[in-house]
Amino acid sequence: MLGRVDLRVALIAASALIASVSVSQAQVELKTYMDDKGYLNVRALTCAQLANTFQEDADFLGAWYSGWWNGHLKRHSINPARAKQGIHEVIVYCKANPDTKVVDAVDDYVKKVQAGGQ
């Protein structure tokens, strides 16, 4: 019983640490990266910029990139579960590779999926 309590305390402490690390990093609004006309150059956006924005903005951009790639590949349907998983994987990749362009991260992910790596 004592071991279970210790494990529970350790898990709670680890969760709190992870949450504090995520929150401690400044989140930047997407409008910071927009030009004076309100446009965002999606080809120039870096993984650091994606990873440092608010989660809902990162998810929105992920959905946009997904649609962009599906259009590029001439696909006219979506698998929502796979798209959400892909968006999550790209965001995680971007957090680990901040200097990479988001379009390159998405391209790498698409190639991985096409090769059967998912």
Model-inferred region functions:
Residues 22-26:
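Sec/Tat signal peptide C-region and signal peptidase I cleavage site
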Residues 10-20:
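Bacterial N-terminal signal peptides
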Residues 106-118:
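Short, low-complexity, Pro/Ser/Thr/Gly-rich segments in the mature regions of secreted, periplasmic
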Residues 1-11:
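Bacterial N-terminal signal peptides that target proteins for export
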Residues 27-108:
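Short N-proximal segments of mature Sec-exported proteins
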